């Protein structure tokens, strides 16, 4: 079992607003070995030169000392992409369609924001780890087939789905291999 921060009880997971995130939390916690460290609901404030400070957040950051880190954005329910409009949406249990933020862009921005945030710290810069592997992926735990959502900017390897909840290690290995 991996280390996951923060460590939540089953009661706390049941109270999360996103049960999709709770599903992925349990899968990563129980399915990754000890050499991984997973951070859940990571937030930051980032200021770039003359710009205003901006808040950021990612659902999961999966870290490995030899592999690097991957930022994962999770979306629950039926998730789809309308290629004619470029819009992402979810479908709830009442079959209602809801526009959602682009999860691919969210994960991509998180990947670079975390790198920028780390580079703010002299201790990190002193480590000379400029080439740490970093990647991004999305996880849709209520979707059965990742291939249906594959796009040029998000190949199916980088899309976790319901079947990957049963073997998250294989999926994470494939994600790191894609970026490595």
Specify the residue positions occupied by each region the protein language model found.
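Intrinsically disordered, low-complexity Ser/Thr/Pro/Gly-rich regulatory segments
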Residues: 1-180
């Amino acid at each position: 079992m991996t280390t996951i921060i923060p460590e939540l009880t089953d009661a706390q997971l049941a109270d999360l607003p996103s049960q999709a995130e709770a599903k992925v939390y349990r899968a990563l916690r129980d399915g990754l070995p000890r050499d991984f460290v997973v951070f859940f609901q990571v937030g930051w404030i980032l200021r770039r030169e003359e710009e205003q400070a901006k808040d950021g957040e990612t659902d999961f950051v999966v870290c490995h000392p030899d592999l690097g880190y991957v930022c994962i954005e999770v979306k629950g329910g039926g998730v789809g992409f309308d290629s004619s409009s470029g819009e992402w949406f979810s479908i709830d249990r009442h079959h209602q369609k809801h526009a959602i933020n682009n999860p691919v862009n969210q994960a991509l921005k998180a990947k670079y924001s975390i790198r920028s945030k780390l580079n703010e710290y002299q201790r990190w810069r002193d480590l000379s780890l400029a080439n740490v592997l970093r990647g991004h992926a999305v996880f849709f735990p209520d979707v059965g087939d990742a291939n249906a959502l594959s796009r040029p900017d998000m190949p199916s390897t980088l899309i976790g789905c319901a079947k990957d909840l049963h073997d998250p290690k294989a999926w994470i290995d494939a994600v790191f291999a894609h970026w490595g």
